[in-house]
């Protein structure tokens, strides 16, 4: 099995506490509301939302994928960090066993810096190159920008 790690960092005008509430704690409700073309709905299959919880994310009509299941690995509201692992679904190809994600929001001026790490666990000796994950990164960044825009347009939300 191979392991390929990719890091990404971007900034937001929204401070970590508010962004974490929208981007992590209430994402299952907010994203289908503001971007139904991306995510149709999210449901908890087992657990209470904390570590060990299994969620099923059903993608919207415009997506190339139908669904994924992920397991919450850690969530820390005090440090604004979140980790989960994609464990099932058509986004996992026959060459990828699982994908683990880590995100941490750090205060930066009056906003945030979002640091994310993706770990691709491949089957056999399959190699994953950064250009293979570029489209997914761009979609995730676009979704993040929608959340940020929503928070700017709704200054009383998630305070």
Swiss-Prot record:
Cited Gene3D superfamilies: 3.30.530.20
Encoding gene (name): PYRC1
Which Pfam families does the annotation name? Bet_v_1
The GO annotation for biological process reads: abscisic acid-activated signaling pathway; defense response
- What's the name of the protein? Major allergen Pyr c 1
Recall the GO molecular function terms of this protein's record.
abscisic acid binding; protein phosphatase inhibitor activity; signaling receptor activity
Q: Which GO terms describe its cellular component?
A: cytoplasm; nucleus
Top-rank taxon, per record: Eukaryota
SUPFAM superfamilies assigned to the protein according to its UniProt record, in alphabetical order = Bet v1-like
Q: Which family does it belong to?
A: Belongs to the BetVI family.
Keyword set, alphabetical order: Allergen, Pathogenesis-related protein, Plant defense
Species source reads Pyrus communis (Pear)
């Amino acid at each position: 099995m191979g392991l390929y790690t990719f890091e990404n960092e971007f900034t937001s005008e929204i401070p970590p506490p508010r962004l974490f509430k929208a981007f992590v704690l209430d994402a299952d409700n907010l994203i289908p509301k503001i971007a139904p073309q991306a995510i149709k709905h999210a449901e908890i299959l087992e657990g209470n939302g904390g570590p060990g919880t299994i969620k099923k994310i059903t993608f919207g009509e415009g997506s190339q994928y139908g669904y994924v299941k992920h397991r919450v690995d850690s969530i820390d509201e005090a440090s604004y960090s979140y980790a989960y692992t994609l464990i099932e679904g058509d986004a996992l190809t026959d060459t990828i066993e699982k994908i683990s994600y880590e995100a941490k929001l750090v205060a930066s001026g009056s906003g945030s810096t979002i640091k994310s790490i993706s770990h691709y666990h491949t089957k056999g000796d399959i190699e994953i190159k950064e250009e293979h994950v570029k489209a997914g990164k761009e979609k995730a960044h676009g979704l993040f920008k929608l959340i940020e825009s929503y928070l700017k347009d709704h200054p009383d939300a998630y305070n």
